[in-house]
């Protein structure tokens, strides 16, 4: 599995970097992991027991060889927007929706003029629609967030009579 962090992983990390390092460590106890990070690996990461490699956001050639060599790819939903070609690969695409950027982003642009807020919102909604259509499985942080994800997936056409007949609880599509 290829685990892709969208945030710096190193000697000083914020929440996302910590989360993806923890996910890579947990998965490495069960499957072969390659960990892709958006910064040069620091020395201490060599002791993790799995390859740690750098890639650049919005630069497909830096991620493509790793993605093509993987059976599954775990990444943040926004990276799916950065790398839409992931949807064309045979690898299972696991999107991590733990960070509800729509809500956070609305707060970040609240002081901007209304037309800028609307422009940001439209772009964000277009990105979200693509993200909810391209994943094979979605992770989230809580049951409440899972409810939000289910609504997003339904509006993207991912939940329908066929998916409900196969998996009435939809845990095979989105889970905590």
Q: Which residues does each PLM region occupy?
A:
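Alpha-helix capping/helix-boundary segments
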Residues: 41, 79-81, 144-146
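Conserved nucleotide-sugar phosphate-binding/catalytic loop shared by glycosyltransferases and other
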Residues: 42-65
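N-terminal subdomain of nucleotide-sugar transferases
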Residues: 1-42
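A short, aliphatic-rich alpha-helical micro-motif
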Residues: 67-68, 87, 132
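A short, active-site helix/loop in glycosyltransferases that binds the activated sugar's phosphate group
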Residues: 126-172
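Acceptor-binding helix/loop patch of EC 2.4 sugar-transfer enzymes
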Residues: 6, 10, 91, 95-126, ...
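Short N-terminal targeting/anchoring amphipathic segment
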Residues: 64-82, 91-94, 137-139
């Amino acid at each position: 599995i290829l685990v892709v962090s969208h945030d710096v992983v190193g000697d000083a990390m914020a929440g996302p970097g910590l989360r993806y390092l923890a996910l890579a460590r947990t998965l490495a106890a069960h499957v072969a992991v390659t960990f892709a990070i958006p910064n040069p690996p620091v020395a201490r990461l060599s002791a993790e027991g799995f390859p740690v490699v750098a890639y650049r956001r919005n630069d497909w050639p830096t991620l493509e060889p790793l993605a093509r060599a993987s059976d599954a790819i775990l990444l943040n939903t926004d990276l799916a927007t950065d790398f839409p070609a992931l949807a064309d690969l045979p690898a299972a695409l696991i999107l991590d929706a733990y960070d509800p950027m729509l809500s956070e982003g609305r707060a970040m642009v609240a002081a901007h003029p209304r037309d800028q807020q609307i422009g940001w919102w439209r772009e964000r909604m277009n990105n979200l629609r693509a993200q909810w259509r391209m994943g094979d499985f979605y992770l989230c942080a809580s049951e409440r967030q899972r409810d939000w994800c289910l609504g997003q997936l339904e509006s993207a056409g991912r939940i329908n009579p066929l998916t409900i007949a196969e998996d009435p609880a939809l845990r095979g599509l989105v889970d905590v």
